[in-house]
A protein has these predicted regions:
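Low-acidity, Ser/Thr- and Arg-rich intrinsically disordered low-complexity segments
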Residues: 4-19, 25, 31-34, 41
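Conserved N-terminal/central alpha/beta ligand/cofactor-binding core
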Residues: 38-42, 46-90, 95-103, 129, ...
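Phosphate-coordination loops involved in phosphoryl transfer and adenosine-cofactor binding
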Residues: 105-107, 254, 293
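N-terminal Rossmann-like FAD-binding beta1-loop-alpha1 element of flavoenzymes
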Residues: 108-132
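Short hydrophobic core segments
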Residues: 109-111, 291-300
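Glycine-rich loop(s) and the adjacent beta-strand/alpha-helix scaffold that form part
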Residues: 295-335
């Protein structure tokens, strides 16, 4: 029952403060106990699975830490990436102001060799498009470095907590960070996207009937998330590179595009190439190359480094400046 006003007035502020402090102390004590139980169970699991010793050390103010040997951490997160073949070679040389510049030709230039860029390149290559992937560093992007532990997927309708594309799209844009049309397109495309990764060999967990194991994640009422563990994103990059190698993809590593070139045809601006710096280029003092193309896919990463608080590796830079200089409009940056 609610307290009456005269009852509240009889409570001493000092007594109330002491009661709150006591309650807070009890809650914190119970929380620490729960954390210790979880950590001890983690240690037992690690000892049993990897036959190594993980120690529980106590810090100040009951902040406990698990001291896990680096060998265990490496085994949990390390992924052996494939050896890249098909390094692109220049077709010809042109002279510009007395400087010899190598020329590379392709139909579509993909900037970035992370999960997004490689997936775009693989799908284009499968459809017979002449693709060239240019990357500042192979296996150095956010996908290959962060190793995120879960990916969201669409699940077919079931009797229990069924799912559909509309509700999935609403969940994607429920935080107000993206528009519904983009969310709906991603929801519809996620079926083929996940199926493609499985076809390439992504080792997602399955139950005894062959269904992918799922769990609920943020803004997820149907249980759409699945995971390969702490190496999920790295494994995605691995299988995509393996597929790219199988398809004979041309890749240009150590390459940074600095300008997108475009011209106007019948009043419509179109891309015709890009100027890039190639660290391995020794035929001119600037390391400058020209890539001739008719389409460009910019997959150099999002604006994570623009924010003070970010979970992305600090050395992973995006290429939004290229898009802005080329006159493109940016949207859904906070997706």
């Amino acid at each position: 029952m609610p307290l009456r006003s005269e009852t509240v007035s009889k409570v001493s502020p000092t007594a109330l403060r002491k009661s709150l402090i006591t309650l807070k102390s009890k809650v914190e004590t119970e929380s620490v106990k729960c954390i210790l139980v979880v950590k001890k169970r983690c240690i037992l699991y690690l000892q049993e699975k990897y036959s190594c010793i993980a120690k529980l050390t106590m810090g100040d103010e009951d902040n406990s830490l698990i001291s896990i040997p680096q060998a265990i951490l490496d085994r949990l997160t390390r992924v052996d990436m494939p050896k890249v073949r098909g390094i692109a070679k220049s077709e010809e040389m042109i002279e510009v102001a007395g400087v010899s510049i190598p020329v590379y030709e392709c139909e579509t230039l993909v900037l970035g060799s992370g999960a997004a860029g490689m997936r775009a390149a693989v799908e284009l290559k499968r459809r017979g498009v002449d693709v060239l992937v240019a990357s500042t560093g192979l296996f150095a992007g956010t996908s290959a470095c962060s190793g995120s532990d879960k990916q969201t997927l669409y699940t077919a309708s079931t009797d229990y907590k069924g799912d559909n594309f509309v509700s999935y799209a609403k969940g994607l844009c429920s935080g107000g960070a993206m528009n519904f049309s983009t969310a709906y397109i991603e929801a519809v495309g996620s079926v083929d996207a996940l199926g493609g990764l499985l076809y390439m060999g992504l080792p997602l967990p399955h139950d005894e009937n062959g269904a992918i194991l799922r769990y609920q994640t943020d803004h997820d009422e149907a249980g759409r998330a699945t995971s390969c563990g702490p190496r999920t994103s790295k494994l995605m990059v691995k299988v995509l590179f393996e597929e790219a190698i199988t398809l004979g993809m041309r890749i240009l590593p150590s390459c940074s595009v600095i300008r997108i070139l475009k011209h106007s045809i019948d009043g419509t601006e179109q891309v015709y190439g890009a100027i890039a710096l190639h660290r391995d280029e020794e035929r001119n003092a600037y390391g400058m190359i020209f890539i001739e193309c008719t389409h460009i896919v910019i997959a150099t990463g999002g604006p994570g480094e623009l924010y003070r608080d970010s979970v992305y590796p600090r050395h992973c830079h995006g290429g939004l400046g290229l898009a802005l200089e080329a006159g493109l409009e940016l949207c859904n940056l906070t997706e």
